[in-house]
């Protein structure tokens, strides 16, 4: 496994600003939508409301309802729609409001989204991001507060990313959108920088203005050690 120090690079970038994780995610999606007309966003309350955790804020005003689709409350339907769009060459970002709800759409996720590429012998790509919120911290009960990234990590065919800071949140979203096969993108509500949740110093940090990728599958140096080799 190779190593990168993305947080240090973000802090030293000449055009960085301090953003919340929510704003960093939305900016990453917007930059990819500007770059690639095949990138679309769909899910419950992701348009007019901007996502209940702010991850799609401003996208409807910027790109319109043809590319930012508020869907009915049917996880099976809109995840299936996203999978079909990906197979046909688009790059959908689908928001599942809470990770806890994945069970009602398990067939679409596990038997279709994750497997189509392999069932086709590698001939069909599924460039799709399934984005979802995890964690608690604001009395929303056990059906809305679980951290289920480990469950997705055990599904063959899935890449799973869980950003812990705004710089990685933007870079990982861009990497996920550009990936040619499914990426499950899980954000913890506690690092989104939402005004109605407890303050978290990790929820706001320098984020470069330009589009950039945080590589998936590379470790980050969180803190350099001082031990010298024997």
What are these model-derived regions, one by one?
Residues 37, 223-228:
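A short, charged/proline- and glycine-enriched loop
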């Amino acid at each position: 496994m190779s190593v990168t120090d993305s947080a240090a690079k973000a802090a030293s970038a000449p055009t960085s600003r301090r953003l919340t994780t929510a704003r960093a995610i939305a900016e990453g999606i917007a930059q990819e939508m500007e770059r690639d007309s095949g990138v679309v966003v769909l899910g419950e309350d992701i348009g007019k409301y901007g996502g209940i955790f702010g991850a799609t804020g401003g996208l409807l005003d910027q790109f319109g309802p043809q590319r930012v689709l508020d869907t009915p409350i049917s996880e099976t339907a809109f995840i299936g729609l996203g999978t079909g769009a990906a197979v046909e060459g688009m790059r959908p970002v689908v928001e599942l409001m809470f990770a806890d709800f994945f069970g009602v759409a398990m067939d679409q996720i596990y038997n279709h989204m994750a497997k189509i590429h392999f069932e086709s012998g590698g001939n069909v790509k599924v460039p799709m991001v399934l984005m979802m919120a995890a964690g608690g911290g604001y009395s929303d009960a056990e059906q809305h507060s679980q951290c289920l990234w480990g469950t997705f990590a055990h599904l063959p065919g899935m890449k799973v990313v869980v950003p812990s800071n705004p710089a990685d949140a933007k870079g990982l979203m861009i990497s996920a959108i550009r990936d040619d096969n499914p990426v499950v993108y899980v954000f913890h509500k506690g690092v989104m920088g939402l005004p109605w949740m407890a303050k978290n110093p990790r929820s706001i940090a320098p984020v470069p203005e330009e589009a950039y990728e945080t590589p998936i599958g590379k470790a980050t140096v969180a803190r350099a050690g001082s031990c010298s080799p024997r």
